[in-house]
């Protein structure tokens, strides 16, 4: 008997429900509860936040299932978990545990340098990172129900997330004025499925939500990404590496919701302690940049 998989419509609909919200990285039940109380729409369960993964080096793998279960039992909001790029078994284990989403994530060490997961063969919806329309279309073609910018995780530096969001949006704008022949050439140049690009052209936007991720450290960062067209925000190290995680979590949720209320954002920022220490992207070699993982 063949395995039943979720339809694109159902998976994308589930992701749409998170639109306008904040998804926070957590490493235990206590942090998950802080995130839920602050108004997060979902949490990402993992063993270490990206800044700690970066500092530790070595091979970063899927979180211990005990951590994921602990988080799932602690909150009522959706729980996501990360699997390595191309690691079929990690993803199947997470699916069997009943997580709400799987992030095929470049934050972890890739298991396969040639192939991403065939996400359309799973029941659980997937979120994936992208830096440009080519990566976005390839992941959608594989069955991703949700996208996010890659940014540069664990840096507290928003510059790469801004670059990736602007690039995807500008390439979508270019695509919308192309005829079918031009789309065919564009698909070849990008190495992306023609059918996905045609759908984007016809709708004038991506068929899935695209969140901001990678470097969000302050309420202002979150609001900026919403201003640039993000459908929501992932916050990794920015909250629990800050001086006051509870205040930062609440402030980032508020700033994401009211991203054009600059007086409120200023007030929120003035009441916070010190944000996480940021890293200059230029001090990170290409080989060490997580955003370079995947294709």
Swiss-Prot record:
Asked if the keyword Lyase belongs to this entry, the reply reads yes
Which family is this protein grouped under?
Answer: Belongs to the PdxS/SNZ family.
> Mind listing the UniProt keywords for this protein, alphabetically?
Lyase, Pyridoxal phosphate, Schiff base
Q: Which Gene3D superfamilies match?
A: Aldolase class I (3.20.20.70)
Q: Which organism is it from?
A: Staphylococcus epidermidis (strain ATCC 35984 / DSM 28319 / BCRC 17069 / CCUG 31568 / BM 3577 / RP62A)
Q: Which residues bind D-ribose 5-phosphate?
A: 25, 154, 215, 236-237
Described function: Catalyzes the formation of pyridoxal 5'-phosphate from ribose 5-phosphate (RBP), glyceraldehyde 3-phosphate (G3P) and ammonia. The ammonia is provided by the PdxT subunit. Can also use ribulose 5-phosphate and dihydroxyacetone phosphate as substrates, resulting from enzyme-catalyzed isomerization of RBP and G3P, respectively.
| HAMAP family with a match to the protein in the record | PdxS
Name of protein:
Pyridoxal 5'-phosphate synthase subunit PdxS
Q: Which GO terms describe its molecular function?
A: pyridoxal 5'-phosphate synthase (glutamine hydrolysing) activity
Q: Name one Pfam family in it.
A: SOR_SNZ
InterPro entries named among the record's database cross-references: Aldolase_TIM (IPR013785), PdxS/SNZ (IPR001852), PdxS/SNZ_N (IPR033755), RibuloseP-bd_barrel (IPR011060)
GO biological process entries = amino acid metabolic process; pyridoxal phosphate biosynthetic process; pyridoxine biosynthetic process
Where's the active site on this chain?
82 (schiff-base intermediate with d-ribose 5-phosphate)
Quaternary structure note: In the presence of PdxT, forms a dodecamer of heterodimers.
Pathway(s) where this gene product acts: Cofactor biosynthesis; pyridoxal 5'-phosphate biosynthesis
The top EC class, named as a word, is lyase
Top-level taxon in the UniProt lineage: Bacteria
